[in-house]
C-alpha cells in the first residue's frame, strides 16, 4: 500500500491517524505524527497526565506506556493491522543505551557511522560517484545527533547538483571527522541532573584560557528531550527506559532549565546574505539546532543578529508548545544568549528601535517575546557562544571547547 502511488503515504497516514483518534489519542498541533492520550482516573480523563505516547515515522511506531496499557494498545493495533515488534535499542540508525540504575539514557549513532564508512570508503566505479548518497547519510547523522558538524555537511549539500571527484573527497574528509566524534552523543539523566554551562558575560582574567572553566547549574527534574525521539523501529514493547519517561511525564511538578543560543555571521559569500545559527537546550541537553541562510540582505551586524534572534525565538516557541502539549509545568522563561550588545539593547529598549525599523514585521518577533516575559535575552562573550558552531568555521581550540559543551561531556563507553 505504501509504495503504490504518490498518494499512498497520505492515504496510509489518514487511515492510521483516524484509528488512533478512535482509541482516544490526541495529535499534537505542532507535529501530526506525535500523539498522547490522557490518563483516565475513576472513569474521568485527566488531561494533565498521559497514559500513553505514540510517535510515528511512516510505518514505524514507538509507544511509551505502562506494560498493561501497552499490551492493550498492541492488541488493538494487531487486530487492525499486520504489525511486528522489535527492541528499543535502535531506531532509524540511532542507538539508545539505558542504565536503569544510574538513570542515564544515551543516544548515539556509532553503528550507523561504522556502516556509512564501510559503504563509502570502498569506491566502486561500477556504482558511479555516490556523492549524493554520502551527503544524505551525513545529513542524517548531523540532524539526529552530531549537530556540531552541521555547517560542514551543509556546505557539501550545496554541491549536489554539480559535484566532482574533489567534492567527493571533501565529503570523505568530513566523514573522517565524524568518525572521530562517533563516541559522542546526547545524554538524558533521570531527574534532569545534566550539567549546564553558564557562559561568561565578560572575559575572565583578560584571556581565553579562563573561559574554559565550567560553571554549572543543576536542574530540578525533567526529560523533555526523550520526546525528540521522533524516529522509530516498528511497534516497540515497553522497556524500563521508556517506562521511566512515562513516569516523568506523569509528574506535574517537573521543571526545567531552558536555554537557547542565537548567533549570526554577517554578509557571507557572493550573495552577502548572513547566516543564522541557533541551538535550543533543556537541562543542558540540545533539543533543536540549525544553520540557515537569511532570506534578506541586511546592512549591519546588528541587524543580522536581530534577525537571527527572531528565528531562534520561533524555535523556542515550537519547543515550548510541544512541552505544553505534554502538560509539563515549566513556568520559568527561556534564557536566550546573544554575543551582540546592540541586538540586546534593541530587543529590550524601545528607544533603540531606529536601527531596525526598516526590517519586516516578522523580524520583530524577538522583541515581542522578550517583552511578554517568555524569553529573557542575555549577553555572553563570543568565545562562549555555542551557536558559533552553526555560523562559521571556528578556530581549532574553540571548536574543541564548544563541541565538548554541546555534547555535555557525553562520551559513549
Regions found by a protein language model. Name each.
Residues 159-162, 256-257, 295-413:
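RNase H-like nuclease module associated with reverse transcription
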Residues 88-197, 209-222, 228, 381, ...:
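C-terminal reverse transcriptase regions that engage the nucleic-acid substrate
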Residues 23-43, 176-249:
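Charged, flexible boundary elements
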Residues 204-219, 233-302:
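RNase H-like nuclease fold core
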Residues 75-86:
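A common structural junction motif
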Residues 14, 38-46, 108-122, 274-290:
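Reverse-transcriptase-like RNA-dependent polymerase core
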Residues 1-76, 126-151, 263-277, 301-321:
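Conserved pre-motif C helix in the palm subdomain of viral-like polymerases
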Residues 5, 58-60, 67, 94, ...:
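Residues immediately flanking
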Amino acid at each position: 500500500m505504501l509504495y503504490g502511488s504518490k498518494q499512498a503515504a497520505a492515504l496510509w497516514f489518514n487511515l492510521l491517524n483516524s484509528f488512533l483518534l478512535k482509541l482516544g489519542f490526541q495529535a499534537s498541533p505542532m507535529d501530526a505524527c506525535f500523539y498522547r492520550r490522557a490518563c483516565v482516573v475513576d472513569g474521568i480523563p485527566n488531561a494533565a497526565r498521559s497514559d500513553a505516547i505514540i510517535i510515528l515515522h511512516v510505518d514505524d511506531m514507538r509507544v511509551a506506556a505502562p506494560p498493561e496499557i501497552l499490551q492493550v494498545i498492541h492488541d488493538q493495533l494487531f487486530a487492525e493491522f499486520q504489525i511486528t515488534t522489535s527492541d528499543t535499542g535502535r531506531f532509524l540508525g540511532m542507538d539508545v543505551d539505558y542504565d536503569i540504575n544510574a538513570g542515564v539514557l544515551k543516544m548515539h549513532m556509532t553503528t550507523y557511522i561504522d556502516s556509512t564508512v564501510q559503504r563509502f570508503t570502498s569506491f566502486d566505479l561500477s556504482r558511479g560517484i555516490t556523492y549524493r548518497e554520502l551527503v544524505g547519510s551525513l545529513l542524517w547523522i548531523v540532524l539526529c545527533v552530531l549537530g556540531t558538524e552541521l555547517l560542514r555537511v551543509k556546505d557539501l549539500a550545496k554541491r549536489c547538483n554539480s559535484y566532482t571527484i574533489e567534492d567527493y573527497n571533501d565529503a570523505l574528509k568530513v566523514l573522517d571527522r565524524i568518525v572521530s566524534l562517533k563516541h559522542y552523543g546526547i545524554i538524558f539523566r533521570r531527574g534532569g541532573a545534566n550539567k549546564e554551562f553558564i557562559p561568561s558575560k565578560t572575559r575572565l582574567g583578560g584571556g581565553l584560557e579562563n573561559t574554559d572553566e565550567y560553571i554549572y547549574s543543576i536542574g530540578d527534574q525533567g526529560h523533555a528531550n526523550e520526546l525528540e525521539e521522533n524516529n522509530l523501529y516498528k511497534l516497540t514493547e515497553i522497556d524500563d527506559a521508556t517506562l521511566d519517561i512515562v513516569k516523568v511525564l506523569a509528574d506535574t511538578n517537573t521543571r526545567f532549565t531552558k536555554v537557547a543560543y542565537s548567533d549570526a555571521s554577517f554578509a557571507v559569500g557572493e550573495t552577502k546574505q548572513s547566516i543564522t545559527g541557533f541551538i535550543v537546550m533543556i537541562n543542558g541537553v540540545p533539543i533543536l539546532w540549525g544553520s540557515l541562510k537569511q532570506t534578506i540582505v541586511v546592512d549591519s551586524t546588528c541587524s543580522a543578529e536581530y534577525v537571527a534572534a527572531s528565528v531562534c525565538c520561533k524555535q523556542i516557541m515550537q519547543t515550548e508548545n510541544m512541552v505544553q502539549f505534554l502538560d509539563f509545568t515549566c513556568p520559568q522563561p527561556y534564557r536566550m544568549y546573544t554575543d551582540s550588545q546592540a541586538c540586546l539593547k534593541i530587543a529590550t529598549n524601545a528607544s533603540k528601535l531606529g536601527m531596525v525599523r526598516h526590517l519586516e514585521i516578522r523580524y520583530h518577533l524577538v522583541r515581542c517575546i522578550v517583552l511578554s516575559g517568555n524569553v529573557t535575552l542575555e549577553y555572553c562573550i563570543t568565545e562562549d557562544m555555542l551557536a558559533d558552531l552553526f555560523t562559521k568555521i571556528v578556530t581549532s581550540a574553540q571548536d574543541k571547547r564548544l563541541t565538548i559543551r554541546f555534547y555535555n561531556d557525553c562520551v559513549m563507553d
